[in-house]
Amino acid sequence: MAKIILTQEVSGLGSAGDVVDVKNGYARNFLFPRGFATPWSRGAEKQIESIKQARAARELSSLEDAQALAAKLTSTTLTVPVTAGAEGRLFGTVRAGDIASAVENAGLGSIDKRRVDLTQRIKTTGVYQAVVHLHEDVNANVEFEVVPA
């Protein structure tokens, strides 16, 4: 097991500044090359403290921003234009990135596509819902309509 420091949020592991133990291969082949983590050392322990202090300072304002964005997202129905056939069947599927770009096109701000959780595969036009994880305490249910482009 390797002891590492996360440099950014990794789903299932933790957020930036957390010290976690992972298997050597996962750290060496996935986390380190993508810049998600650095090896743990005593000197890096001091970096962790500064990251955590900065995160705590941002936490309060980001919570308020996330709640404001969640209120906007739940009150708006997004439109996702996709290529579809005559009967409404899509050529492909709607992905989390499509929802994130629809939020940006609607002028509501930008969100990371990794924070969008689609509960089902979308293969036809219609109205659907997704969950957007804006903050660890704030989730927004987003309603969107898939329309032919």
Swiss-Prot record:
The keyword Membrane does not apply. One of its GO terms (cellular component) is ribosome. GO terms for biological process: translation. It comes from the Bacteria. Coiled coil: none annotated. GO terms for molecular function: rRNA binding; structural constituent of ribosome. Binds to the 23S rRNA. Belongs to the bacterial ribosomal protein bL9 family. This is Large ribosomal subunit protein bL9. The lineage of its organism: Bacteria, Bacillati, Actinomycetota, Actinomycetes, Micrococcales.
